[in-house]
Amino acid sequence: MTGTTPLPSSSLSVEQVNRIASNQEQNPFDILGPHPYEHEGQAGWVIRAYLPEAQEAAVICPALRREFAMHPVHHPHFFETWVPEETLEIYQLRITEGERERIIYDPYAFRSPLLTDYDIHLFAEGNHHRIYEKLGAHPCELENVAGVNFAVWAPSARNVSILGDFNSWDGRKHQMARRSNGIWELFIPELTVGAAYKYEIKNYDGHIYEKSDPYGFQQEVRPKTASIVADLDRYTWGDADWLERRRHQEPLRQPISVYEVHLGSWMHASSDAIATDAQGKPLPPVPVADLKPGARFLTYRELADRLIPYVLDLGYSHIELLPIAEHPFDGSWGYQVTGYYAATSRYGSPEDFMYFVDRCHQNGIGVILDWVPGHFPKDGHGLAFFDGTHLYEHADSRQGEHREWGTLVFNYGRHEVRNFLAANALFWFDKYHIDGIRVDAVASMLYLDYNRKEGEWIPNEYGGRENIEAADFLRQVNHLIFSYFPGALSIAEESTSWPMVSWPTYVGGLGFNLKWNMGWMHDMLDYFSMDPWFRQFHQNNVTFSIWYAFSENFMLALSHDEVVHGKSNLIGKMPGDEWQKFANLRCLLGYMFTHPGKKTLFMGMEFGQWAEWNVWGDLEWHLLQYEPHQGLKQFVKDLNHLYRNAPALYSEDCNQAGFEWIDCSDNRHSIVSFIRRAHESDRFLVVVCNFTPQPHAHYRIGVPVAGFYREIFNSDARSYGGSNMGNLGGKWTDEWSCHNRPYSLDLCLPPLTTLVLELASGPESLSEAANSPL
């Protein structure tokens, strides 16, 4: 060992050493690590290290094959030595801690930050679209040494350190360096994927906050809250063909039928069945005290094996997942997010979720995520009061808090906060290949007085209640999504009359390409919950939606929100005895799938679950042993098949040219009839809905073209549990004008039924019609 003689006097003051020892130095690189230092006329380097648990330390220079003892300076755990070399290569530290000896690389020897000044500039502007590749924890190599680079935005912090198993959760050991714009950064050599970590943030009042990483790619399973180092670039994707096709698609011309799912309550596995990872190794059980005894969550990989074939068989085009970003409380359904960049660990690893999405794409199923940029919870390890100040939220509770939900509101006027959220939306498309987002609670973002009484909100700069900053943010997000990912979906859950929600940003719209039609949903559920006799007085509930159907690009959704909190499940809302309940539901769904607009159904509705949705349970799968439930499931399957194979039902969903009434005025019989037309085609369908239990043996409607109209769908079919009334495969027109049309059909209308008829185009179609069972 050489270099054992200490420097005659250190260049450091006691104050500098104490700042390091007390974790008060904002740039530890100014003190720790290697520094050029001439000693007795010879060029060299002074190397300093603060090692809180070490009794002895030495510097190992592998290139020189030499070792230099370090000596305490002003503090028993602050060590220093001098190395007589003009050029110093990366060195190691030999540390003696009691009876244990370790050799490590010095984090403060690595001075090549991952973040560039340009990265920081873009972030400060709010325009770094891939900031998730810079902030957070990223496995990388510096100076040919593998490790993890950490970076976090905490501008009001006095000091920030990294905590983890690798340093005994001691914030003194890995103190981060402050960069411009309040970003803190440090590379920890030899750290690997899977390490748990947090940030220890100290403010100027001396308060210490332990926070999970806002940009962390993985978190521990709750109730633990640490982030986990993850590498999202290791998975090998197999969906290139899907992504290429999506890029060239025009979503509004496509059939979009969405199955809305909460992964934790769709189906459970027996707790005796051991879940495994990609290599077949057993996974530790996820603690869920509120699940039924003997049950556990399915993993992402198990869901790929069970959910995807189920959805594929039913004919849905997309799966929409209730939020899978990390959240601490199961009962929030995922809508109170703490880890915006982390797929929840309840069901497996990031690679497991990638596998799930990949399998969906390989089976022709798109994936939509519920995204929650409107608010976030107050959990101490999350974004709230992140650096000891209101960093992500507004300081004034009149702007920064949703009291009804007990959550905080993002400050959309702050560039870095907008960047955090906008990049997060792009992140899910980029890293997880998702196909769309549904933005939750858009109305709560757009209105400053949302669920607030007078005096509980602050007007905008013009004295109005519109949240101008939030609207601008949504325009920015949607513009970026469609710029980077053509063919993607961005869907708004917006419950007010805010104009042009689904119009392009270049004409002043918010830029979504679809909006949930909340008005249609409320009108339909009100209407179908009535005794059918009273429906004649409420025909407007059925017809009103067409008046505004083309003012936005609408999606018709019967979602999770309608089957909780005492509202009953969908089948339970229907009046009458069991037969009528199922017939009503089939009629409702038939009208829904023939009405203009894309479609969304929540899980369990497809087979008539009686119980309300329970996030702690799973679906009532045992009901499928009974014929009415089997029939309803078959009905939904056939309805999806009809919808996806009939361009007239989807290609002009957002255009008046795709719809025309035949008759919407037959209030007395509660019957409506209309035509759906295909894009740039003469093909059309005739739809007739009878909303009462009263059948009609002879009901005449006008049609525009003479010929044989084949009955291609009848919700009263015996296979669905209906009475099997119908039109024996179809009807020829009569030269009898009706409803201002030159020809008409004399139809048999079954009770509580949706009928769909198609003009036969040739002898083959006529033959098919003749062989139809109805």
From Swiss-Prot:
GO MF entry, a single one: cation binding
This enzyme's EC code(s): 2.4.1.18
SMART domains xref list: Aamy
Top EC class of this enzyme: transferase
Active-site residue numbers: D440, E493
Temperature dependency: Optimum temperature is about 35 degrees Celsius.
InterPro entries noted in UniProt: A-amylase/branching_C (IPR006048), Branching_enzy (IPR037439), GlgB (IPR006407), GlgB_N (IPR054169), GlgB_N_E_set_prok (IPR044143), Glyco_hydro_13_cat_dom (IPR006047), Glyco_hydro_13_N (IPR004193), Glyco_hydro_b (IPR013780)
TM annotation in the entry: none
Gene Ontology cellular-component annotations: cytosol
Cited SUPFAM superfamilies: (Trans)glycosidases, E set domains, Glycosyl hydrolase domain
Catalyzed reaction equations: Transfers a segment of a (1->4)-alpha-D-glucan chain to a primary hydroxy group in a similar glucan chain
Protein function: Catalyzes the formation of the alpha-1,6-glucosidic linkages in glycogen by scission of a 1,4-alpha-linked oligosaccharide from growing alpha-1,4-glucan chains and the subsequent attachment of the oligosaccharide to the alpha-1,6 position.
Family: Belongs to the glycosyl hydrolase 13 family. GlgB subfamily.
HAMAP family on file: GlgB
PANTHER family: 1,4-ALPHA-GLUCAN-BRANCHING ENZYME (PTHR43651:SF3)
NCBIfam families: branching_enzym (TIGR01515), PRK05402.1 (NF003811), PRK12313.1 (NF008967)
Protein name in UniProt: 1,4-alpha-glucan branching enzyme GlgB
Organism: Synechococcus elongatus (strain ATCC 33912 / PCC 7942 / FACHB-805) (Anacystis nidulans R2)
